[in-house]
């Protein structure tokens, strides 16, 4: 998109200020949605409560499709949080981008590989943690030598591949969408004909990007449940 992200140094590490800002914004939005949707609960839900119950039922279906509820019920909150957080993050960069002094401040946080790979690493680490916690270290390690011991190196490579593909898939789709939107926005500033030519494609692509953002949030959450089920279920 041709703009740099402002950075800050802390303890010898470099952090992107725009990433910190947008991660915070996404977190606050998800928190507010959760609070507003559960503020006044009723036996006969309506409006916002219907929405949050639909999200819960949807994620519960993802859990049940990968493992039995007794094993996977504890991951419901994780799944709901990931689904809502990633969807909100994917949407933040769609309406506009804020650039100040050639520094890009407002964007989708998931359009940065540092964010998506961090989420992926968190998911994979959690899957290993729960695998050891729920099955024991011995049963957990034996899976790396099944069905044949010589496949152990491939199992290790698979773990790294899962982490990379989980994070980079999300990043690539969201970043590509923002690149195209920025190109269309640039075309719109070239004059009257450019504005006319870019307006309809931009609206269509923004609508399609909402669909893509929702699908990517679903895929990330689904794969999270798949990876967790592989580690915590004895039949995988």
Curated annotation (Swiss-Prot):
GO terms for cellular component: plasma membrane; proton-transporting ATP synthase complex. Gene3D superfamilies: ATP synthase, F0 complex, subunit A (1.20.120.220). Keywords: ATP synthesis, Cell membrane, CF(0), Hydrogen ion transport, Ion transport, Membrane, Transmembrane, Transmembrane helix, Transport. Pfam families: ATP-synt_A. Disulfide bonds: none annotated. InterPro entries: ATP_syn_F0_a_bact/chloroplast (IPR045082), ATP_synth_F0_asu (IPR000568), ATP_synth_F0_asu_AS (IPR023011), F0_ATP_A_sf (IPR035908). The chain crosses the membrane at residues 18-38, 80-100, 112-132, 179-199, 200-220. GO terms for biological process: proton motive force-driven plasma membrane ATP synthesis. Its main location: membrane. GO terms for molecular function: proton-transporting ATP synthase activity, rotational mechanism. It is a multi-pass membrane protein. It is found in: Cell membrane. The keyword Transmembrane helix applies. Belongs to the ATPase A chain family. Key component of the proton channel; it plays a direct role in the translocation of protons across the membrane. F-type ATPases have 2 components, CF(1) - the catalytic core - and CF(0) - the membrane proton channel. CF(1) has five subunits: alpha(3), beta(3), gamma(1), delta(1), epsilon(1). CF(0) has three main subunits: a(1), b(2) and c(9-12). The alpha and beta chains form an alternating ring which encloses part of the gamma chain. CF(1) is attached to CF(0) by a central stalk formed by the gamma and epsilon chains, while a peripheral stalk is formed by the delta and b chains. This is ATP synthase subunit a. It comes from Priestia megaterium (strain ATCC 12872 / QMB1551). The gene is atpB.
């Amino acid at each position: 998109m041709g703009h740099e992200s402002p950075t800050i140094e802390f303890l010898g590490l470099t952090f992107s200020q725009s990433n910190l800002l947008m991660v915070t914004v996404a977190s606050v939005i998800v928190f507010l949605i959760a609070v507003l949707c559960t503020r006044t609960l009723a036996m006969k839900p309506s409006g916002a409560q219907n929405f949050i119950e639909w999200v819960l039922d949807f994620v519960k279906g993802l859990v049940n499709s990968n493992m039995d509820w007794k094993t996977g019920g504890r991951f419901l909150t994780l799944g709901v949080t990931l689904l809502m957080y990633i969807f909100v993050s994917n949407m933040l960069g769609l309406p506009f981008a804020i650039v100040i002094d050639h520094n890009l401040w407002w964007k989708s946080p998931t359009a940065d590989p540092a964010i998506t790979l961090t989420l992926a690493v968190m998911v994979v680490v959690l899957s290993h943690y729960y695998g050891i916690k729920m099955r024991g270290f011995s049963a957990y390690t034996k899976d790396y030598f099944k069905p044949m011991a010589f496949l152990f190196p491939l199992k290790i490579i698979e773990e790294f591949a899962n982490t990379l593909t989980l994070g980079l898939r999300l990043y690539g789709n969201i970043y590509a969408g923002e690149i195209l939107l920025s190109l269309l926005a640039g075309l719109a500033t070239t004059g009257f004909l450019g504005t006319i030519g870019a307006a309809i494609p931009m609206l269509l692509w923004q609508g399609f990007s909402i669909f893509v953002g929702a699908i990517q949030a679903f895929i990330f959450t689904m794969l999270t449940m798949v990876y967790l089920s592989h580690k915590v279920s004895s039949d995988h």
